Amino acid sequence: MLTALQLQQQRRRRALPSLKQQYHEYILQRIEAYKDSLSRPELLDLGNEALAEMEAAQGDQFLLTEVLLTDWVDRLIHKRLSLQPYSRWLKHFKLLRSAQREPTRWGIERRCPIVRLLPRLEQGDTALIIGGDAAPIAYLLAAHDVEVIFAGNDMTFVDQVESRVAEEALGHFCTTYVAPTTDFPPELPPQVNIVVIDTATLGKETSTRRRHVLEGLMARTAPCGIHLIVPSEHSLAPEAYLSHYAE
């Protein structure tokens, strides 16, 4: 992440994945999300339907393998979801990404501190986002090509975040984990540039555990990195946690 002085002297940026790569990743994530939404009987029915289509298309001229069946299942889901071909997706994607980079799309007010941070972001910057009320910031940062790890201890909510990320074609830049507040996701880099946590998550911990959490996050934050504590309903204001910081 650029410091204020470095804004005028941006270093060479790391190459982004191609649009083709992002498209294929988007398709894969939509298909996997659809599979995850099905019950076991529904998955079996889907497999039987795919098998019937294979037999109708190829007769006896095929050797059934798990890979082949999976490919036909994916084709069937692709059709059910009416996923766009690359050319149409590309036109939509460019407009979508521009809109996604606006804080208001995610319900984030322009006075939010994260908005002032956006001009300083660089490709390859990393962020750890913790807690449901911080999820909109995860989407916004991912739209700005930040490598985001979102963590929460509510599996249902984390699944919802994962689905939203897939629908918004942000999957390349945002990974989700279900994890206790005191446990860092396994793929978290040794240091990150941005840490965001909501007060509801902190409020559930004892004072001792809270200090342990914040000190652990500070230790994993890169020099000149940023910590942002965002407010949650029925929780203490973010300012209540300033005493945990030395400065």
PLM region descriptions:
Residues 1-101:
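N-terminal accessory regions of S-adenosyl-L-methionine
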Residues 105-125:
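Conserved alpha-helix/loop element of class I SAM-dependent methyltransferases that forms part
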Residues 122-134:
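Conserved class I S-adenosyl-L-methionine
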Residues 134-146:
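Conserved SAM-binding loop of SAM-dependent methyltransferases across substrates and taxa
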Residues 147-153:
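Conserved SAM-binding motif I beta-strand of class I
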Residues 160-189:
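S-adenosyl-L-methionine
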Residues 190-210:
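A short SAM/SAH-binding and catalytic strip from SAM-dependent methyltransferases
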